[in-house]
Amino acid sequence: MAKRLLPALKYTPHTYFIKAVLASTGETVGLAGWTGPGNPCIHNIFRRSAIDYYGWKEKMGWTDAEIDEMWSHVSDENWSVQFGKDDDTRKEIFGDEPHWYLAPLLTWPEYQSRGVGKRLLNWAIDQADKTEPLTPMYLESAPTARAVYMHVGFVPQGAYNFVRRGPAVVRGLEAEEGNDAQREKLEEVSVEAMAEEMEAHPAI
């Protein structure tokens, strides 16, 4: 996957991959991919068609055989068809309105429910809430994560589409996540850009 995403980091200036790092050990415990509001178009970088859409084949010097190999183990339904439908939904919601887009957000299993995901969310939320007017945000969520996003102000727009327009707590499903005070919290976790690391180690 890293090889497929490398051109997004090299040639798409408004794409950010960040990681959560445990301060005591330097261990990576989660990561997030954000597309910033400066991006002029809506076309998910995970779609195979992004190669042609963004001109990555020429920029990376890839052959057709290399591209076929990179996508040989990938479900077209999950990675192209569904992401295409999601892009259409996002266009319907925002049109040309600048916004932040989250995909993906991952926390290593042993560190889930310990605040890592919120740190990765806050990296962009803090920036979105500093603008005037506030910059909206968008994501698609698995059913098991809906409450996490609602707790920081994301409002459902369908089965798994969410929009956030400023600070709020959307009452309802977030209660299923339990009391934050009862969760085991991590020691200090920092959030860092990981573009340089992925470029240096494309097999990651």
Question: Where do the PLM segments sit?
Answer:
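Conserved GNAT acetyl-CoA-binding A-motif
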Residues: 98-102, 127-141
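Conserved beta-strand-loop-alpha-helix junction that forms the acyl-donor binding cleft
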Residues: 105-112, 137-148, 162-169
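Conserved acetyl-CoA-binding loop-helix of GNAT-fold acetyltransferases
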Residues: 104-107, 113-126
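Conserved acetyl-CoA-binding loop of GNAT-fold acetyltransferases
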Residues: 150-159
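Conserved acyl-donor/pantetheine-binding loop and adjacent beta-alpha core of acyl/acetyltransferases
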Residues: 27-106, 112, 167-204
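Active-site rim helix/loop that mediates acceptor-substrate recognition in acyltransferases
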Residues: 1-17, 21-25
